[in-house]
């Protein structure tokens, strides 16, 4: 029963890591990255559709994204969605594809993005600590219900704390790597 609590906590913490990685992917670092467009949704035949489901996204150069729609009639809708997004990148429509040239980041923008990365990383650590709290509460409930002994509870709490420490360290590493990526010119 104790292993179930730890496995459940590990699984939820892994989901937090994956969520953080997706969030970091959406923060542009002056280089083209297809995940920048993950949050862009296009009005396609009356339905909000993720851009990556109606177009292929390629990276022909280090700072250029090329969006090639599967259906050429959706080109204007895609361009409209990209203009409405908060990417800060102006799309260039050449009739068959849309080019997105990623502008170089200024020093000030880099610092602002680094602050945002820290904030996102801190939110991920808070989520992990909440998962730890839930796991600890579950362990204490089991001890109260006499399903586990007090000694088993102490061991379980140590194991949960170790898993949490590992998860927080992983988040710190991810955050430091993203900050380094942002701040290098």
From Swiss-Prot:
Q: Note whether Cytoplasm occurs among the keywords.
A: yes
Family matches, as InterPro entries = Ribosome_recyc_fac, Ribosome_recyc_fac_dom, RRF_sf
State where it is primarily located: cytoplasm
Q: Name one GO molecular function term.
A: ribosomal large subunit binding
Write down the Gene3D superfamilies for this protein, in alphabetical order: 3.30.1360.40, Ribosome-recycling factor (1.10.132.20)
Annotated GO biological processes are: translational termination
Identify the keywords attached in UniProt to this record, alphabetized.
Cytoplasm, Protein biosynthesis
Write out the annotated subcellular location. Answer: Cytoplasm
Which family does the entry's similarity section mention?
Belongs to the RRF family.
Physiological role: Responsible for the release of ribosomes from messenger RNA at the termination of protein biosynthesis. May increase the efficiency of translation by recycling ribosomes from one round of translation to another.
Q: What is this protein called?
A: Ribosome-recycling factor
Instruction: State the species of origin.
Output: Streptococcus pneumoniae (strain Hungary19A-6)
Name the gene that codes for it. frr
């Amino acid at each position: 029963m104790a292993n179930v609590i730890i496995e459940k906590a590990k699984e939820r913490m892994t989901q937090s890591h994956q969520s953080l990685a997706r969030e970091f992917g959406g923060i542009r670092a002056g280089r083209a990255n297809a995940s920048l467009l993950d949050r862009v949704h296009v009005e396609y035949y009356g339905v909000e559709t993720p851009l990556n489901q109606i177009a292929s996204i390629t990276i022909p150069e280090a700072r250029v994204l090329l969006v090639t729609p599967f259906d050429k009639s959706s080109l204007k809708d895609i361009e409209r969605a990209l203009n409405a997004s908060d990417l800060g990148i102006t799309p260039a429509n050449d009739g068959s594809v849309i080019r997105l040239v990623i502008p170089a980041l200024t020093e000030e923008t880099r610092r602002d993005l680094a602050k945002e990365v820290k904030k996102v990383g801190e939110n991920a650590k808070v989520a992990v600590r909440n998962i730890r709290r839930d796991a600890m509460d579950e362990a204490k409930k089991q001890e109260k219900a006499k399903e586990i002994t007090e000694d088993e509870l102490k061991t379980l709490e140590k194991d949960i704390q170790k898993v949490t420490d590992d998860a927080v360290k992983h988040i710190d590493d991810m955050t430091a790597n993203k900050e380094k990526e942002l701040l290098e010119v």
